[in-house]
Swiss-Prot record:
Induction / repression: Up-regulated in the skin of psoriasis and atopic dermatitis patients.
Name of the featured protein: Protein GPR15LG
Localization of this protein: Secreted
Record has Signal as a keyword: yes
Domain of life: Eukaryota
Naturally occurring in which organism (per UniProt): Homo sapiens
Disulfide bond annotation, renumbered to this chain: 40-63, 41-60
Signal peptide boundaries: 1-24
Gene Ontology CC terms, in alphabetical order: extracellular region; extracellular space
Length: 81
């Protein structure tokens, strides 16, 4: 009897934890598979930024074209009127 009560309480606790840990988090933006993203590369000015052959290293990352204002929506919340 005690084992049944403890196991059901544990299941309820794990269920609540899994729901509340993901609620309100932003979903990562999906990468566009059909489009190639342009890379923005910057030369690193420090002397320690050379590779073994002596060539300068560039820091490259995807360019941000236009920052979109995203609304943060809590899943399951009712709209405010």
């Amino acid at each position: 009897m005690r084992l049944l009560v403890l196991s059901s309480l544990l299941c309820i606790l794990l269920l609540c934890f899994s729901i509340f840990s993901t609620e309100g988090k932003r979903r990562p933006a999906k990468a566009w598979s059909g489009r190639r993203t342009r890379l923005c590369c910057h030369r690193v000015p420090s002397p320690n930024s050379t590779n073994l052959k002596g060539h300068h290293v560039r820091l490259c990352k995807p360019c941000k074209l236009e920052p979109e204002p995203r609304l943060w929506v809590v899943p399951g919340a009712l709209p405010q009127v």
